[in-house]
Amino acid sequence: MSKPKHIRTLADTEAQAVARNIRVSPRKLNLVAAMIRNQPADKAIAALTFSRRRIAQQVKKTLESAVANAENNHQLDVDQLVVKTAEVGKSIVMKRFHARGRGRSARVEKFFSHLKIVVAERAEAPEETKPSRGTNKEQKAA
């Protein structure tokens, strides 16, 4: 008997997708990732579809991959998926030089990022009924 190749770090109701070395700065990518955190997966995909930011299409592709992983690898219900986390991390930084006036040069840094999206099945919470809004006299009498 051999050991499993890797230990599953996620819960059974979760799936993930990772995009590495995306050519955008982590700061800009985090703006798009913040849009989809804690959103239902279908609403997050719709928001990314109509986002005007360039990187939104790559984030959408990664989110769709996480949803596909949940459906095909873990048999989760696609309609119940919610974006649990969208983590953004730093990757490499390419250094380049830009020619300036008088024979000088300036250093240009091109940032890369990592993106990890975890989707989870939302737990069905029982519907809570709001108490009726009566006057203070009714509340004191009860």
UniProtKB/Swiss-Prot annotation:
GO terms for biological process: translation. Pfam families: Ribosomal_L22. This protein binds specifically to 23S rRNA; its binding is stimulated by other ribosomal proteins, e.g. L4, L17, and L20. It is important during the early stages of 50S assembly. It makes multiple contacts with different domains of the 23S rRNA in the assembled 50S subunit and ribosome. The globular domain of the protein is located near the polypeptide exit tunnel on the outside of the subunit, while an extended beta-hairpin is found that lines the wall of the exit tunnel in the center of the 70S ribosome. Residues 122-142 are annotated as: Disordered. Gene3D superfamilies: Ribosomal protein L22/L17. Keywords: Ribonucleoprotein, Ribosomal protein, RNA-binding, rRNA-binding. One of its GO terms (cellular component) is cytosolic large ribosomal subunit. Signal peptide: none annotated. Coiled coil: none annotated. It comes from the Bacteria. Part of the 50S ribosomal subunit. This is Large ribosomal subunit protein uL22. NCBIfam families: rplV_bact.
